[in-house]
Amino acid sequence: PCASYVNSGGQNIQGDFDGTHCRYSPAFADAGNNITTDLTIPSLENGGVHVFEGSLFVGEAHANNAELAAAGIIEGGDGPTLTIEAGATLAWPDNTKFVIINRGSQIFAVGTADNPITFTATKDAIEGSAGLEEVQLWGGMVVNGFGVSNKCEYTGTRGNDLALVDECNIAAEGAEGLDESYYGGDNDDDSSGRLEYVIVKHTGAQVANGDELNGISFGGVGRNTLIKNLQVYSTYDDGIEMFGGAVNFENFVGI
């Protein structure tokens, strides 16, 4: 019942099922071992949890226009898609591990009122020992897109004849080295996917003063990304933090 994919060498890479939970080593996904093909994470029966030892980065972090062009990435949907089934729970062991949806990639995490999708820490989901207000138990989420940012230079008017003067590839907060990712562009209509009935809790990390991982960081995320019924609970720094873009929210609770 565990998630699997076929890597570039033709090998089938799959999580290990222990009878209840699915466990994924860094050989499945981690910083420097990004997911570069479509991946579906199923719901597990009997309270099963998807436990990741490494970070889950979807798509590649292209730092400049030449890299984006070589990869054929110009908008959301050009890269791999992460699909998470309703009722699934995903967990990570510490706050050096987190989730990135890179520009061009998309996440479709669509839960229901009775079966939400949960992103949390193993201390919460597996050990059951997380305090209600504990933070920094795992990193959190970063979702990037090609939306407009005031950190880039444009001509014209937003929503009319806007055009970039130069490249727009902004390093996202909360990461360095292999953990780095980038956001920004001139496409406020970009789509990074859909989050609905999603819970994110016990997150956060500080890389430097004023440079943190939040519950979810949205970098240049466009308005065609659908976000509805989102709950972010017990997070270090901010529940959500917006860096440019034009995404809208319907029903958000931050506790």
Write out the residue ranges for each language-model feature.
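Beta-strand/loop edge motif enriched in small/polar residues
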Residues: P1-I255
